[in-house]
Amino acid sequence: MRHRRGCRKAGAKTTKFKPGDSFYAHLNVHNLGGYAQYAVASEVEAASKPKSISFIEAAGVPAVALTAWQALIDTAKLSAGQTVLIHGGSGGVGSFAIQIAKARGAKVIATASTANQDLLKQLGTDVAIDYTKQKFEDIAKDVDVVLDSVGKDTLARSYNVVKKGGFIVTLVARIDQAELDKHDIQGASLRTEPNSSELAEIGKLIDEKKIRVIVSHAFPLSEAIKAQEQVATGHTRGKIVLKVADEPK
């Protein structure tokens, strides 16, 4: 939940940005500071804001889009023609993961509740699974990659649908090495890292209309607690952001 208005002051060694530039950033986990009107970001954490979207929309991109990118592209090495199963496809990470996978030329199977089946299809999902009515393992078989943002029983059942030599990435739990060995697959637990070049690539896809940003609600900074409570429900559609200032004119 970060709203980046732009560069207010640049450090002496800063070469990429100058005061007045518009950028977005994923702050290092050791610094954070996004719940504020002003924050400090290094050049390796920031990239120019996509021109085709608002600042509110831009705030909903860095953390979740980088997570999806680093899970699918950097970690699982997803390539054209492969099949990926994305759990929680209507959420922040999931909605970006679907579109990144499609831009990569992959076939996408995604899970979501009944209310979000329409969104899965709008985002380009090839096979949409309603987890309230269907077991994903009855539909998704021998997939190349699984992206898990749910954990628990969903993760435990996901090992069974990955083909030999495939990859499973979880964002919320530890990978079970015994299960990886049993199914002869690879796996990893992911922690997202700041990456300005990947943010720039994501921004390019957004401006090319290959990625659509979904922001379900923008809370004022004074209602940060309400925003956190909404996130904690685990049923957020797209991204929730904090608005810390009016859009620049």
Where are the regions a protein language model picked out?
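Glycine-rich beta-strand-centered segment in the early N-terminal region that forms part
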Residues: 1-30
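Glycine-rich helix-loop-beta junction characteristic of Rossmann-like nucleotide cofactor-binding loops
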Residues: 74-78, 139, 160
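Hydrophobic beta-strand signal
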Residues: 24-25, 40, 85, 169
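A short acidic, Gly/Pro-enriched loop at the edge of an enzyme's catalytic core
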Residues: 137-145
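Glycine-rich phosphate-binding loop and adjacent beta-alpha segment
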Residues: 31, 149-212, 221, 243-249
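Mid-domain Rossmann-like dinucleotide-binding core that forms the NAD(H)/NADP(H) cofactor-binding site
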Residues: 19, 59-130
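N-terminal Rossmann-like NAD(P) cofactor-binding module of classical short-chain dehydrogenase/reductase
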Residues: 24, 129, 144-147, 169
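A structural motif shared across PLP-dependent enzymes of the aminotransferase-like
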Residues: 30-43
